[in-house]
Amino acid sequence: MLQWRRRHCCFAKMTWSPKRSLLRTPLTGVLSLVFLFAMFLFFNHHDWLPGRPGFKENPVTYTFRGFRSTKSETNHSSLRTIWKEVAPQTLRPHTASNSSNTELSPQGVTGLQNTLSANGSIYNEKGTGHPNSYHFKYIINEPEKCQEKSPFLILLIAAEPGQIEARRAIRQTWGNETLAPGIQIIRVFLLGISIKLNGYLQHAIQEESRQYHDIIQQEYLDTYYNLTIKTLMGMNWVATYCPHTPYVMKTDSDMFVNTEYLIHKLLKPDLPPRHNYFTGYLMRGYAPNRNKDSKWYMPPDLYPSERYPVFCSGTGYVFSGDLAEKIFKVSLGIRRLHLEDVYVGICLAKLRVDPVPPPNEFVFNHWRVSYSSCKYSHLITSHQFQPSELIKYWNHLQQNKHNACANAAKEKAGRYRHRKLH
């Protein structure tokens, strides 16, 4: 027992006596206590110390206590909040930085808390300031994209750095900028930094950017928990470089989008552009998921309310161009949440803008719709497509789009006869 105490308890044998005591005089004792108390206060009031990670690293600029009612159809009537507004910040484009300097090492970063901590390390190592403000530097930017043409529609496509095949498939299909004759479309892929920080991958992305000029990338970690940052990057880019664009769609890289139906049946270029317009698949009355094992887990510390405001599924929503700047600016005074579509809904509630339902509730789908040319000629989004599937079904729809439902009926009858014969 004595050996264990010597190895693991004390580095040197000490005997205690009044002669050795730090408190052998009243004055020394008082000074020692004052010093210890001062050190305690110093360490207790600094959140940047190592070993103290947590939600304090997440940008927090308000205390939220609202959105408790699910009866109201409006997005703001049940808004009961205590806001702590931050000083207005102007939209300032950041100069692109050299990607060769991106030498962080967030290997294996997963989960909400680790992502927030890694974001903080990027700020510290890059010297970009405190994460309470949105100041991520551009690695790749396209500031002159809207100077060459005046787009009617901008497609903001959230993509992972390694999804090269998905980006190629989108360029060949629904993201083709020449898809609608007489209608200017701009396609922009939104990227962060790959968790693996593969130098070859970053070089390939830069080559891809030089060829297509449709990638914008900033130096935040590209994770699920940073989708809100990615979307705000797109909003800020539109507000800064394409402020007069009538409409914007934000969607994901695994989506099927019927761009022609979106333009001609929903947005209708012949009509005057709408303002404060936001639509998609409406999510009403949803409660925060408190299951810590869930992908959609929302900690009570971040969002204590019992209900989310009305929001649109992040798989695909459409909004008027004037909202890009409004959403980005109001976000600077709102606590950042990792659920991007919920967060955008909160921004809209603060702006007192109600998302409106689309003409048909099956136009926007955040699930995969079984394919038929008839169904896909009358929808805008369908989810979970591999690049090869996207090309296959897109080509089939283009071949049959003028008689989509008639051809679909013929194909169905042909399959029925084939099964009957065999």
Swiss-Prot record:
The UniProt-reported impact of residue 88 to S is: In strain: BLG2/Msf and NJL/Msf
List the catalytic activities from the record.
Answer: an N-acetyl-beta-D-glucosaminyl derivative + UDP-alpha-D-galactose = a beta-D-galactosyl-(1->3)-N-acetyl-beta-D-glucosaminyl derivative + UDP + H(+); a beta-D-GlcNAc-(1->3)-beta-D-Gal-(1->4)-beta-D-Glc-(1<->1)-Cer(d18:1(4E)) + UDP-alpha-D-galactose = a beta-D-Gal-(1->3)-beta-D-GlcNAc-(1->3)-beta-D-Gal-(1->4)-beta-D-Glc-(1<->1')-Cer(d18:1(4E)) + UDP + H(+); a neolactoside IV(3)-beta-GlcNAc-nLc4Cer(d18:1(4E)) + UDP-alpha-D-galactose = a neolactoside IV(3)-beta-[Gal-beta-(1->3)-GlcNAc]-nLc4Cer(d18:1(4E)) + UDP + H(+)
The cofactor required is: Mn(2+)
**Which residues face the membrane's Cytoplasmic side?**
1-20
Membrane topology label: Single-pass type II membrane protein
What tissues harbor this protein? Detected in brain and heart.
Q: From the Swiss-Prot or TrEMBL record, what is one GO molecular function term?
A: N-acetyl-beta-D-glucosaminide beta-(1,3)-galactosyltransferase activity
- Record field: compositional bias (Polar residues): 95-110
What effect on the protein does mutating residue 100 to T have, as reported in its record? In strain: CAST/Ei and HMI/Msf
One GO BP annotation of this record: protein glycosylation
EC id: 2.4.1.86
Q: What class of enzyme is it?
A: transferase
User: What are the glycosylated positions?
Assistant: 75, 98, 119, 176, 226
Gene Ontology terms: cellular component: Golgi membrane
Record's keyword terms, sorted:
Glycoprotein, Glycosyltransferase, Golgi apparatus, Lipid metabolism, Manganese, Membrane, Signal-anchor, Transferase, Transmembrane, Transmembrane helix
Q: In which pathway does it act?
A: Protein modification; protein glycosylation
Q: What is this protein called?
A: Beta-1,3-galactosyltransferase 2
Q: What organism is this sequence from?
A: Mus musculus (Mouse)
- Where is the organism placed in the taxonomic lineage, from the top? Eukaryota, Metazoa, Chordata, Craniata, Vertebrata
